[in-house]
Amino acid sequence: MSQEKYIMAIDQGTTSSRAIIFNKKGEKVSSSQKEFTQIFPQAGWVEHNANEIWNSVQSVIAGAFIESGVKPNQIEAIGITNQRETTVVWDKNTGLPIYNAIVWQSRQTAPLAEQLKSQGYVEKFHEKTGLIIDAYFSATKVRWILDHVEGAQERAEKGELLFGTIDTWLVWKLTDGAAHVTDYSNAARTMLYNIKELKWDDEILEILNIPKAMLPEVRSNSEIYGKTAPFHFYGGEVPISGMAGDQQAALFGQLAFEPGMVKNTYGTGSFIIMNTGEEMQLSENNLLTTIGYGINGKVYYALEGSIFIAGSAIQWLRDGLRMVENSPESEKYALDSHNNDEVYVVPAFTGLGAPYWDQNARGSVFGLTRGTSKEDFIKATLQSIAYQVRDIIDTMQVDAKTAIQVLKVDGGAAMNNFLMQFQADILGIDIARAKNLETTALGAAFLAGLSVGYWKDLDELRTLNETGELFEPSMNESRKEQLYKGWKKAVKATQAFAEIDD
């Protein structure tokens, strides 16, 4: 009797690594998760130990096997999805990182980004990469490491150092250095990749003085990149055949294959992506133009709005302010709040993302009175996530010249019913929550399975992930607009405060 075959997805996130085993129906068979250390060397800096990330991935692969009883030789293929932009530079010969991984959230390279802006490169970078010049993307992070690690520039020029985002690092480790590759979706987030010409941009590399020899080969999102070295996969030699940055993987996992489809993942940050099809649309309103995915010889573009603080605002309530013991508790407190929504929290802890791109803004609270309770504060924090999503959806509709009818949602905070209902109310459109909230991992699994024939085609995938629950708007128009107007005032005041000179 032939053994049943499965697909494993490795989901390497900002705060934890996970391995999930899926069956042919797209159902989760088992999963394992491990958190790792967040390193904050200075205010606004965020780093990870890349070796610790690799160890956590090894650990969760084992955990998924142990929990399910599935053996390594039953895994047909592996899909990888990852926190994007986070930057690793390592020694080609020893495999050891020369510095910590600089995380997407980290602002330590903001002065470099400002310097590029002041040199007049904003338009050039936008046209080539689809991105706004910001410390968020990998380009300035690579430059920072080459500047701050002694001898790094020289070694990079000699071809002794390699650069990669987390996907590249994991494939390199899993294949024992046999494959130094990335995919379209991750390359598009480096600010070094020309998304129109689909190649590393020589002019940008020259401006930043980043040696091309460091860069990985860019491949499609669904093909075999290499096989696991048996000693790194518990004896199994398994093809790694699907790869996408976490948000693009979620777009694919949400089956948003048609132009105009939009998804939002409520994770650490919140990321809204619209599939715009095979045409690259440059945003005129500070959204990012990026690559959604490339499969079967075609590349599908996307518009994206990035919110830096979403689920992490709830973590802040839990860990920083100790107002809740766990994240789900925030829903109960929000429902117990009886104020008139006059409190606004602007969680600009690491600046404001799209459409403001204000890296100097910091968190603020408005509208407090003597009667404000803990419940009100928690509710306002949840509402801030929904308001930020509205900022982006409004902008996206202008850029894409289309009305969005429904927003597909997933991610941890999408489990919060209060937040989902308020999101529907403040947007005035339906919110469709995926039945399987593991859409990021599922997207990576789908991409891996397609390339080895585990699933036949997109039509077969369409039968695998249904909508779980629909939230319909119930707030009247004038109330909705009054609340949103208050939010816009709060953001304006937050930005003004950051601009006041000492």
UniProtKB/Swiss-Prot annotation:
Is Zinc given among the entry's keywords?
A: no
- Which InterPro entries does the record match to this protein? ATPase_NBD, Carb_kinase_FGGY, Carb_kinase_FGGY_CS, FGGY_C, FGGY_N, Glycerol_kin
EC number(s) stated in the UniProt entry for this protein? 2.7.1.30
Q: What class of enzyme is it?
A: transferase
Residues annotated for ADP binding in this entry: T14, R18, T268, G311, G412, N416
- Regulation of its activity: Activated by phosphorylation and inhibited by fructose 1,6-bisphosphate (FBP).
| Modified residues annotated as Phosphohistidine in this record | H232
Q: Which domain of life is it from?
A: Bacteria
GO terms under cellular component: cytosol
- What reaction gets catalysed by this protein? glycerol + ATP = sn-glycerol 3-phosphate + ADP + H(+)
Pathway assignment: Polyol metabolism; glycerol degradation via glycerol kinase pathway; sn-glycerol 3-phosphate from glycerol: step 1/1
Give the record's PTM text: The phosphoenolpyruvate-dependent sugar phosphotransferase system (PTS), including enzyme I, and histidine-containing protein (HPr) are required for the phosphorylation, which leads to the activation of the enzyme.
Function, as annotated, reads: Key enzyme in the regulation of glycerol uptake and metabolism. Catalyzes the phosphorylation of glycerol to yield sn-glycerol 3-phosphate.
Write out the similarity annotation. Belongs to the FGGY kinase family.
* Complex and partners: Homotetramer and homodimer (in equilibrium).
Q: What is this protein called?
A: Glycerol kinase
Task: Provide the species name.
Answer: Streptococcus sanguinis (strain SK36)
What gene does the UniProt entry assign to this protein?
glpK
